[in-house]
C-alpha cells in the first residue's frame, strides 16, 4: 500500500497551525504574490517563515503555490520572489507555468517542483514530459476519472507522484482556467483575482430583442447555470488508494479555520481507518459523513471521478452554502486566572451551550460560564468580531481547540 499524504490548504498562519494540529501531512500556502488567491489573507515573509518552522517541528511539510500564468512583466518579480523563498526552505513549490518552472529550476533547484492542476495534466505523456523537466509531482486535472488516473500511474515511474483534489469547490472552467471573471469584471482568474461569476444569477437575451432580458427559471430566484456542487470523496477512499494517488488534496485556500479543521480531521481519520482495516472504514462511515457536513459547504458530488458528471452535479436553483455550525474561535492559551484566551469570530453569550472540537475527533458540549474582556471586565455576551476575550467553559481546554455552535 502506497504512503498517502493528506494535503490541506491554509489561508493564514493561524489556519496553517490548525491544519497541522488537526491532521495534515502537508499544507499548501500562498505568499503575497504569484499564488492565484488575491482575496486570501496569504502569508507575509515572516508568517511564512514561522509557519514553515511550526510545521516542520510537527513533522509536516509546507508547499508554496507559485501557480500564476505569468506575463512578461511578471517574470522579474517571479525571479525575485523565488530567491526569497529559497531562504525559507519550503518543501516544494507548486507551479503551473513552464517559464516559472524553468526559473525555479535555475534559482532554487534544491526545492522540489510540483506541477499544479492549472497546467491541465490529463494524460501520462504530459506527466512524463514534466518528469523529464525535473518535476517530483504532477497534479491531475479535475476532469480525470479514477480509471484514467490509474492508467497514468501504470505508465509513469514510481518516483513521480500523483496529486489529486478529493474535496472542495469545483470550478466550471477546464482545470480552473476561467475567462468569465476577466470578461465580466476585468479581474483575471489566472492572475489570482477571480470574482466567481460562475455563482451569479443569469438571464438570457434573444438575438433580435437585444434590450429584453428574460429570466431563466428554476425557481422564483432564477437559475445558476454554472454553479457546481462541491467535490467530496469521503465515501470512496478505497478507490483513491487503488488508483495509485500519492497525495489527497483538499481545496480551500480561502476557507476558515473551522472548515479546514473539520475537513482535515475527517479525512485524517478516514484514511487512517482504511489503512488499519477496510471494515473499520466502512463501520465509521456515518461519523465521517456527519462530520464533513458540520462546516459550510454546498451539496456534494463525485465530480469526474466516475465519468462525465450528470446534470445532478450542478446546483441550478441557488448559490448558497449549507451551514450546520458557526465558528466562534480558537483556544490560544490562558491568563493568570486560568481563563482561556480566544479571539472571537461570531457572537456568543454566557449561559449558551457550545461545542469544543478537538483534534483527536472528540466533540464536547459545554456551557459558557464566564466571559471577560482584556481589561478584566465581565461581559454577558461577546458581540464584537475579533475581540480578544477570556472565557470559562467549566471544562479543561487545550491550545488549538476550536469552539463552534450548532445552528
Labelled PLM ranges:
Residues 99-100:
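Alpha-helix capping/helix-boundary segments
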Residues 39, 117-121, 140, 224:
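Alpha-helix capping and helix-loop boundary segments enriched in small/acidic/polar residues
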Residues 76, 113-124:
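Gly/Gly-Pro- and Ser/Thr-rich, intrinsically disordered tail segments characteristic of DNA damage-repair
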Residues 1-10, 15-21, 26-33, 51-52, ...:
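Surface-exposed amphipathic alpha-helical tracts and adjacent flexible/coil segments at the periphery
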Residues 37-54:
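Glycine-rich, positively charged N-terminal anion/phosphate-binding segment
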Residues 108:
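Conserved phosphotransfer cores of two-component systems
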Amino acid at each position: 500500500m502506497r504512503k498517502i499524504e493528506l494535503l490541506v490548504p491554509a489561508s493564514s498562519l493561524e489556519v496553517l497551525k490548525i491544519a497541522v494540529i488537526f491532521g495534515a501531512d502537508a499544507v499548501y500556502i500562498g505568499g503575497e504574490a504569484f499564488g492565484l488567491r488575491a482575496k486570501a489573507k496569504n502569508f507575509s515573509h515572516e508568517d511564512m517563515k514561522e509557519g514553515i518552522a511550526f510545521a516542520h517541528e510537527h513533522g509536516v511539510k509546507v508547499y508554496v503555490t507559485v501557480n500564476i500564468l505569468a506575463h512578461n512583466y511578471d517574470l522579474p518579480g517571479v525571479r525575485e520572489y523565488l530567491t526569497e523563498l529559497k531562504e525559507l526552505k519550503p518543501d516544494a513549490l507548486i507551479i503551473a507555468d513552464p517559464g516559472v518552472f524553468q526559473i525555479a529550476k535555475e534559482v532554487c533547484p534544491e526545492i522540489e517542483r510540483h506541477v499544479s492542476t492549472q497546467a491541465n495534466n490529463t494524460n501520462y505523456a504530459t506527466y512524463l514530459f514534466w518528469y523529464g523537466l525535473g518535476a517530483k509531482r504532477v497534479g491531475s486535472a479535475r476532469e480525470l476519472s479514477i480509471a484514467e488516473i490509474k492508467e497514468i500511474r501504470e505508465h509513469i515511474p514510481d518516483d513521480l507522484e500523483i496529486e489529486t483534489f478529493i474535496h472542495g469547490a469545483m470550478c466550471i472552467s477546464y482545470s480552473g482556467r476561467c475567462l468569465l471573471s476577466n470578461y465580466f469584471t476585468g479581474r483575471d482568474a489566472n492572475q489570482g483575482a477571480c470574482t466567481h461569476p460562475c455563482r451569479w444569477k443569469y438571464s438570457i437575451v434573444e438575438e433580435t430583442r437585444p434590450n429584453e432580458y428574460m429570466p431563466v427559471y428554476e425557481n422564483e430566484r432564477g437559475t445558476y447555470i454554472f454553479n457546481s456542487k462541491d467535490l467530496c470523496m469521503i465515501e470512496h477512499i478505497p478507490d483513491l488508494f487503488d488508483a495509485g494517488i500519492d497525495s489527497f488534496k483538499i481545496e480551500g485556500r480561502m476557507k476558515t479555520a473551522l472548515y479546514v479543521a473539520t475537513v482535515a480531521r475527517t479525512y485524517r481519520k478516514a484514511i487512517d481507518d482504511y489503512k488499519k482495516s477496510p471494515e473499520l472504514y466502512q463501520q465509521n462511515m456515518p461519523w465521517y459523513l456527519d462530520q464533513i457536513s458540520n462546516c459550510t459547504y454546498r451539496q456534494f458530488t463525485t465530480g469526474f471521478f466516475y465519468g462525465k458528471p450528470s446534470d445532478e452535479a450542478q446546483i441550478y436553483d441557488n448559490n448558497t452554502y449549507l451551514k450546520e455550525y458557526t465558528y466562534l474561535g480558537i483556544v490560544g492559551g490562558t491568563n493568570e486566572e486560568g481563563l482561556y484566551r480566544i479571539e472571537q469570530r461570531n457572537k456568543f453569550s454566557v449561559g449558551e451551550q457550545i461545542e469544543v472540537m478537538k483534534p483527536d475527533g472528540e466533540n464536547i458540549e459545554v456551557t459558557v460560564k464566564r466571559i471577560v474582556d482584556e481589561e478584566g471586565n465581565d461581559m454577558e455576551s461577546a458581540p464584537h468580531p475579533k475581540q480578544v476575550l477570556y472565557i470559562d467553559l467549566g471544562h479543561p481546554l487545550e491550545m488549538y481547540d476550536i469552539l463552534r455552535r450548532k445552528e
